[in-house]
Amino acid sequence: MKKMDLVSITMSLVIGLIAFFVSNNIFVCIGVTLIYVLYYFVLARKIIKTYNLKTIKIKSCLYFINTFLITLSIKDSLEDAFEHASNNTDKEFQQLIYEMQEMNVNEKLDYLKKYYSYSSYRMFTKVISLYLDQGGNVLKISESLLNEVVRIDETMNESESSSKKKLVEFVILWLLTFLVLLFMRFALSEFYFSMLKSIPFFALLIVFFLLCLVSLHIFLKRFTKLPVNEEGELNG
């Protein structure tokens, strides 16, 4: 989160600097900067961190299920399947792998239920139990599960791509708004400063920066809304 912290603080300082230019008031500059910085560290940072952790966890689960089943169908070995499926970058998952060193594969799969509390993982463990009891082609047994895993993964990727496009649109919209305000401040300075002496106009400037923060919060909540619920199932 260090990179995100730096970006957010820089953005807060830039917005605070804009507030100084358009209000010609150092106290407004300091106030706006502090409000934006506090918002990030009190609310936004937690929202972003939760979103990132949830995204990593569900994608880690989907990768594990898909890789395990495909490897099992090729090598017909639970140990090899687990080893290949465990090669992901989820740090919390890797910590669990360390804790499960003395367990056999079946015990490991059962232990992971505590971490992967998703319906797809519970279905996965049932598929493995059925395969061990009855044998057969594991890919045929798990066909519907694999299709669902692919569908969830594709939906999450599409949602992430769509959110990034909306983020670009959001940034451009507010950037243009700030540029218009700065244009009035510097290109029409005489007219602008005469308006700035008006208390209602000065108050509107402060409201403007507060509205910007509110719109940022609303966008952030929408941006970090995952297309899956707590069970790992697609919404709707």
Feature roles, as predicted:
Residues N25-G31, Y118-Y121:
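Membrane-interface starts of transmembrane alpha-helices
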Residues K2-I26, K166-G236:
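Alpha-helical transmembrane anchor segments
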Residues A44-K49, D90, Q101-D110, K114-M123, ...:
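Inter-domain helical "communication" segments and dimerization helices
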Residues V28-Y111, K126, L226-G236:
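Juxtamembrane/interface alpha-helical elements of multi-pass membrane proteins
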